[in-house]
Amino acid sequence: MYGEKAKKVLLHIIRSGGIVAEETLGKDIGMKSNEARKILQQLADEAILRYKTGRVGDKTLHLWILNIDQIEGILIARLKKTREKLLIRLNYEKNNTFLKCPLCGRRYTFDEAFENDFLCPYDGEQLIEYDNSEEIRILEEKIKEITDELSRIGAA
């Protein structure tokens, strides 16, 4: 979802009992404070975390708490959203003919190639037909994996 850095933040939060202070997070995991704060905000935007302030003596702490009770719903929603995007991409791959530049490797739809007289607009090479059956196979496989997982948890 957000890469290795977000994974590092989440694992630290989980290992810390589901709650961390923003003020110490960056130092604890070896990350810049502003970078950690940005990841915390992204995770909060997805409702994976919630924010709360607390006081310790005269200091105000910014606490981030894992939304354990909502994680399943969040993951189901994310899986469905991912499946929908993959279905859109699969439809695009199945309903277009592609050509590829043998020199730079850029890929074009038939319409794009036609507009450029079947020459690569970057280097002038003659475009060749491109077989996207492997992309289609991978997309179908991933869609099936997600659908099977959603069925397994009763959320298809």
Swiss-Prot record:
GO BP terms in the entry: regulation of DNA-templated transcription; transcription initiation at RNA polymerase II promoter
Gene3D superfamilies: Winged helix-like DNA-binding domain superfamily/Winged helix DNA-binding domain
A matching Pfam family: TFIIE_alpha
GO molecular function: DNA binding
Keyword Transcription: yes
Keywords assigned by UniProt, alphabetized: DNA-binding, Transcription, Transcription regulation
HTH TFE/IIEalpha-type domain residues: 1-72
Signal peptide: none
Keyword Coiled coil assigned: no
SMART domains referenced in this protein's UniProt entry, alphabetically: TFIIE
Function (record text): Transcription factor that plays a role in the activation of archaeal genes transcribed by RNA polymerase. Facilitates transcription initiation by enhancing TATA-box recognition by TATA-box-binding protein (Tbp), and transcription factor B (Tfb) and RNA polymerase recruitment. Not absolutely required for transcription in vitro, but particularly important in cases where Tbp or Tfb function is not optimal. It dynamically alters the nucleic acid-binding properties of RNA polymerases by stabilizing the initiation complex and destabilizing elongation complexes.
Quaternary structure and interacting proteins, as annotated: Monomer. Interaction with RNA polymerase subunits RpoF and RpoE is necessary for Tfe stimulatory transcription activity. Able to interact with Tbp and RNA polymerase in the absence of DNA promoter. Interacts both with the preinitiation and elongation complexes.
Free-text comment on this protein's domains from its UniProt entry: The winged helix domain is involved in binding to DNA in the preinitiation complex.
Family under the similarity heading: Belongs to the TFE family.
Protein name: Transcription factor E
Lineage: Archaea, Thermoproteota, Thermoprotei, Desulfurococcales, Desulfurococcaceae
Underlying gene: tfe
